[in-house]
Curated annotation (Swiss-Prot):
It is found in: Cytoplasm. Homohexamer. Forms an RuvA(8)-RuvB(12)-Holliday junction (HJ) complex. HJ DNA is sandwiched between 2 RuvA tetramers; dsDNA enters through RuvA and exits via RuvB. An RuvB hexamer assembles on each DNA strand where it exits the tetramer. Each RuvB hexamer is contacted by two RuvA subunits (via domain III) on 2 adjacent RuvB subunits; this complex drives branch migration. In the full resolvosome a probable DNA-RuvA(4)-RuvB(12)-RuvC(2) complex forms which resolves the HJ. Belongs to the RuvB family. Residues 256-334 are annotated as: Head domain (RuvB-H). This is Holliday junction branch migration complex subunit RuvB. Mg(2+) binds at residue 67. The gene is ruvB. One of its GO terms (molecular function) is ATP hydrolysis activity. Residues 1-182 are annotated as: Large ATPase domain (RuvB-L). It comes from Staphylococcus epidermidis (strain ATCC 35984 / DSM 28319 / BCRC 17069 / CCUG 31568 / BM 3577 / RP62A). It holds the Pfam family RuvB_N. Has 3 domains, the large (RuvB-L) and small ATPase (RuvB-S) domains and the C-terminal head (RuvB-H) domain. The head domain binds DNA, while the ATPase domains jointly bind ATP, ADP or are empty depending on the state of the subunit in the translocation cycle. During a single DNA translocation step the structure of each domain remains the same, but their relative positions change.
C-alpha cells in the first residue's frame, strides 16, 4: 500500500514536525474539550491525594493525539514517562525489566496496547492492580515463582482498536477516554499554530480550506500544510494564499471532502463497474488491485463515516451522496 497524504497512520517524515508542535500542558492542547475537562479533575484530585493517577486507556482513530496526551499527563503529574509499543514486549521479562525501573508515580505509556501477547498481558494484571510481579524462574522441577514489588505507577494505554482488548485488561483501567475527530474550527486553530512554528503566514481562507480537507485529523492537517507551504515558497509568495492552497490540493489530488485518488478509484469502481453495488469486498479488492484487509481497515471507514458507502449483507453499496459527489467530480475532470 502506497503512503497517502490523507493517511491517518504515522509517517516517518511526520516525526520532527509532530515533536516540535507537541503541547506539554492541557491548557495548550487544542480540541477534545471533554477529555481535557475530565483529565484536569482527575489529575488535580490525584495530586491532592498524593497518589498516582488511575490507569488511563486512550482510544480512537490514529492521528488524534493519544501520544501527546500521555506526555501531557506525565508533565501535569510532574513525573517521568517511559514509552514503549505493545509488539515490542515479547516476553514477560521484557515487561518486568521496564516496570522494575520505574520510580514512584511514573507513567508507563504502552502504544498499540491491543497487540500485547497473552503471556505478557497476564503478567501485567497484578502489576496494574496490586503493584507486584510474579515471575517464574527456571524450568520443570526447578521452576519457582519470585514476587517483585513495584512502586505505584500509572499505565497509559493507547489503542485504535479498543474492541480488540481483552475484558480483563480493559477493566483494569480506571479512566477510559475516547478521542473524537476534530471539528473545523479546532483544526483551523491547529493549522494556524503550525504555520507559526514553520515560520510562514497563512490567510484565514487557506487555514479553513485545509481544515475542511483534513478528515478531522491534526496529523493530516499538518502534513497537508507542509506540502502547501512548498508551493508557496516555490511561488515566492509572502504567505499562503487561498489560490495557492486550492491549486496545491488539486495537484495533490485531495478533494473538498478530504478524499484522495484511492477513494475515488474505489468509489468509481463501485458506481461505474458494478452499478453502485452491492458488490463483495473481494471483488472490489481484485478490481482496484488492493488487499481486502486494507480496504476494510484503511479505506472504507472514512467513506462510511461520511455517508458515501454503506455495508449491506450482500456487499458494499454506493449511497445517493456518493453518486452526487463522484459523478460531479468526474464531470469536472472531464
Amino acid at each position: 500500500m502506497d503512503k497517502r497524504m490523507v493517511d491517518q497512520e504515522f509517517h516517518n517524515e511526520d516525526t520532527d514536525l509532530e515533536l516540535s508542535l507537541r503541547p506539554t500542558q492541557l491548557k495548550q492542547y487544542i480540541g477534545q474539550s471533554s477529555i481535557k475537562s475530565n483529565l484536569e479533575v482527575f489529575i488535580k484530585a490525584a495530586k491532592l491525594r498524593q497518589e498516582p493517577l488511575d490507569h488511563v486507556l486512550l482510544f480512537g482513530p490514529p492521528g488524534l493525539g493519544k501520544t501527546t496526551l500521555s506526555n501531557i499527563i506525565a508533565n501535569e503529574m510532574e513525573v517521568n514517562i517511559r514509552t514503549i509499543s505493545g509488539p515490542s514486549l515479547e516476553r514477560p521479562g521484557d515487561l518486568a525489566a521496564i516496570l522494575s525501573g520505574l520510580q514512584p508515580g511514573d507513567v508507563l505509556f504502552i502504544d498499540e496496547i491491543h497487540r500485547l501477547s497473552s503471556v505478557v498481558e497476564e503478567v501485567l494484571y497484578p502489576a496494574m492492580e496490586d503493584f507486584f510481579l510474579d515471575i517464574i524462574i527456571g524450568k520443570g522441577d526447578e521452576a519457582r515463582s519470585i514476587r517483585i514489588d513495584l512502586p505505584p505507577f500509572t499505565l497509559v494505554g493507547a489503542t485504535t482498536r479498543a474492541g480488540s482488548l481483552t475484558g480483563p485488561l480493559r477493566d483494569r483501567f480506571g479512566v477510559h477516554l475516547r478521542l473524537e475527530y476534530y471539528n473545523e474550527n479546532d483544526l483551523k486553530e491547529i493549522i494556524t499554530r503550525t504555520a507559526e512554528v514553520l515560520g510562514t503566514d497563512i490567510d484565514k481562507e487557506s487555514a479553513l480550506e485545509l481544515a475542511r480537507r483534513s478528515r478531522g485529523t491534526p496529523r493530516i492537517a499538518n502534513r497537508l500544510l507542509k506540502r502547501v507551504r512548498d508551493f508557496q515558497q516555490v511561488n515566492e509568495d509572502d504567505q499562503i494564499y487561498i489560490e495557492t492552497t486550492k491549486r496545491a490540493l488539486q495537484l495533490l489530488q485531495v478533494d473538498q471532502h478530504g478524499l484522495d485518488y484511492i477513494d475515488h478509484k474505489m468509489m468509481n469502481c463501485i458506481i461505474n463497474q458494478y452499478n453502485g453495488g452491492p458488490v463483495g469486498l473481494d471483488t472490489i479488492a481484485v478490481s482496484i488491485g488492493e488487499e481486502r484487509v486494507t480496504i476494510e481497515d484503511v479505506y472504507e471507514p472514512f467513506l462510511i463515516q461520511r455517508g458515501f458507502l454503506e455495508r449491506t449483507p450482500r456487499g458494499r453499496k454506493a449511497t445517493a451522496l456518493a453518486y452526487e459527489h463522484f459523478n460531479t467530480t468526474n464531470e469536472k475532470r472531464e
